[in-house]
Amino acid sequence: MTVLPDSLPLQSRGPSSATLAAKLWRRSRKLAASTFALALATLYTAIRAAHAYRVATFNLPPNPTNPSPNPNHLPLNPAKAATSRPALEPPAPLEPPPTPPHPPRLRILHLSDTHFYRGREDLVGWLQWLASRAGQDYDFVAVTGDMLSSFYGDRYLAQAALRPFAQTGMPGAFVLGSHDFYENRPGNPLSYLRRTPSRGAHKAVLDPSFGRYLRAFLADSGWADLNNARTSMQVNGVLLELSGVCDPHIRRDRYVGFGPDFGPVPAGPGTATQSVVAPQSAPKPDGVIRLGLSHAPYSRVLNRFAADGADLVLCGHTHGGQVCLPGGRALVSNCDLPPSLASGVFLWPPVGAGADVALVEDVAGVGVEGSCGGVPGRGPWGVSRMFVAVSPGLGTSYFTPLRVFCPPQAYILGLS
């Protein structure tokens, strides 16, 4: 009979539980440190990306009435034209866009969503440089709101950034966004994952003193105030009819159509509206360009512009999704448009079976929010299609100062 020893030799024993625990602890610490370092590097890269300002140029062909090969999203000759970095490096010189088959009659600089707060001084310098290109690269300035995020940005940054444009004598127009009326406040980021109807601002968060410096500057700038108003002007020998609405996202919009000077039509903060209270638009004369401005690209507002023969509507608000998948594929739009339309230039109304944008509105009456399938041919009501440019904006929220696969951009749009 074999007798087993009371204990195994020391060299034949496995590692003790204490030794295993120590090894696991060391490995978990290394993994945690590596993960933390990677997260910091990613965050740093995303924050720097939010300061890499660019200009994108689009040349829009005339008469966009026929369906395009990609009718719901049409990036037309985009060209990265200028880039800057946070370290005060001089911007790269503008690269000329591809020569269009129809030379543009009018070039529009579109600025949106600067969201000025302390820490965006580099954007002020970049915009001052861009102002020096007035007359060389663009003939008209359009501002579509959300220029502010804080009292500091209102008092010290917004005027410093925009005044050089006005001092050139460049004609322009503007509408306001919700954050030109009240400061950014933290919110639930998951709420952006759903398509949202206009929500109406709570009056308790509106401060009459917020934005007063920006509004005072704009009032003295000589630019057209298109907040629920319309006007017309000659720019480079082109008769330009302008119409705009105050921010539909907080239901301040009152659509006024195109035609002789009218407005502004007042709208109280958070007042519910479906955007139609104005006189009927005048018939569109030959050779006239009709330009619409709205901070948020809600479908009911786009439908109104399309019904009145707009050639181009400029919007912001979406930040292009701000945090996107590779290739700039947005996850959210923060309005009732699909994420695929969160930035860029596209034709409206959409056509084809894949069009999932809200298009349920009675032209003669009140707009209705909702969604439906595609619409045929030239869009609802037999109207011609128009271009819509949704800017990804130049800034970010104070609470999420980063961008992922979504560079901050200003647009220059050439209209033939």
Locations of the language-model features?
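Core catalytic region of metal-dependent phosphoesterases/phosphodiesterases
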Residues: 62, 117-234
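Beta-strand-turn-beta hairpins that frame and shape the catalytic cleft
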Residues: 62-67, 77, 85-88, 94-109, ...
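Conserved beta-sheet core of the metallophosphoesterase superfamily
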Residues: 297-411
